Structure formats: C-alpha cells, structure tokens
C-alpha cells in the first residue's frame, strides 16, 4: 500500500489528523453537538479563516488554535494566549473562571502543596490533561495505522479501536530508497514484514517494556 515514510523510533516529520467527537449532553446554556477537531503540525497549515486580514500571521506564540462558531471565529495562540475574534469585535465577557497569573507549572505545584480537603484544582489537572493527552496520541496512532485506509473508531473507556478487522495486516516503510536511474526517478522502498494490525495497534497503546536496569551494589 502507498504509505508515506514513517520513522519507527520517532514521530512523523509532519502530520494532519481529523478527530470527530460525537454529540454530548447539552450543558445548561451551551449546546454540545458533534464537533470536528483538525490537528496540524510539522509545518502543515490550515486554511485561513474567511475575513482574516491579509498579512495576518496565524502562528501566534508558537502555534495557533481556530474556533469556528455560528457568529464569529476565534483565534488564539499556544495555550490560549492572546485570543481575538476575526471580526475585530471585542466582547464584554464576564470573568467567571479563576485567572492563572503564574505559569501552569507553578499552578500545579501550588495545588500539590495545598491540603487535600480544601485544595483548589490546577487549571489543567490530571482529570483534564489525561484525556487531552489520550486524544493527541490517538492521532499519532491513526497516522501509524494509515496503511489500513479507513476511518478508525476509538473506544476510550476500553482503550482500543473497535473497527480494525481481525485479519487486517499492516506494514511500514523503513527506507525510502528514492534514486535517479537512467534519468528517471525511481522508488525502491524497503518495508517491514506484514504484521497483524490489531496486535500492532495494541502494542502501541499498551507497550511491552523490557526489564529495567539494575544498579550495581554501591560501596558503603
């Protein structure tokens, strides 16, 4: 199968991943319909939102996030820095959330040091950061499984893909082998041996680690 070159021991040089989250129960004042999230990295860029001024750089403080709403489009930098609306409108939004005036690392340290009975959770505690990290690495899994040529359905509670066929096989390019032969571009890829796709995916999800190192006896 025509698979782009993937590196077995590191992340892809660039990737684009599309996540589709099903509709959720509505919140008191906010509807929660199905939503799509598009992830770009490695220099790949999304389309510029309609109405964004010419010359305006989307990359703000190391990255950007674009939120398409029914009334406007919001753009912010990495970690939500410097948000603005494409229309130029500046809304008078009530401040109902605790503002983090220090780094998120120190906010986490503060929460660790506080008494458990009256602790104020950090702005990105494990209950939030864990599922977020799961989403990101699930996209990396999808890139490594692209040879299946299918949309993958994820079962979060059971940490597995539900629609990979039992007999599906997958292989990965380990050497590109591109060269010019007699003036013509030639592609001579080297592939891994085919492996069962379900087992391959499960090993990536729950890796089998080797035994740890043992330190020699220390002198007293």
Please give the residue ranges for each predicted region.
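Glycine-rich, aromatic-lined ligand/substrate-binding cores of catalytic
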Residues: 2-126, 130-169, 173-220
């Amino acid at each position: 199968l025509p698979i782009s070159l993937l590196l077995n021991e590191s992340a892809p040089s660039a990737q684009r991943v599309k996540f589709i989250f099903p509709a959720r129960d509505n919140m008191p004042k906010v509807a929660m319909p199905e939503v799509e999230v598009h992830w770009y990295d490695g220099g790949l860029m999304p389309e510029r939102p309609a109405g964004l001024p010419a010359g305006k750089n989307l990359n703000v403080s190391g990255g950007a996030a674009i939120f398409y709403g029914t009334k406007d489009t919001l753009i912010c930098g990495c970690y939500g820095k410097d948000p603005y609306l494409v229309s130029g409108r500046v809304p008078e939004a009530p401040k109902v959330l605790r503002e983090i005036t220090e780094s998120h690392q120190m906010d986490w340290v503060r929460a660790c040091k506080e008494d458990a009975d009256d602790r104020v959770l950090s702005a990105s505690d494990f209950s939030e950061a864990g599922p977020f990290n799961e989403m990101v690495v699930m996209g990396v899994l999808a890139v490594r499984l692209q040879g299946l040529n299918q949309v993958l359905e994820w079962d979060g509670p059971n940490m597995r893909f539900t629609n990979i066929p039992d007999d599906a096989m997958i292989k990965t390019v380990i050497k590109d082998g591109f060269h010019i032969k007699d003036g013509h571009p030639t592609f001579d890829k080297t592939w891994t041996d085919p492996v069962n796709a379900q087992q391959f995916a499960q090993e990536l999800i729950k890796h089998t680690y080797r035994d740890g190192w043992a330190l020699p006896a220390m002198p007293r």
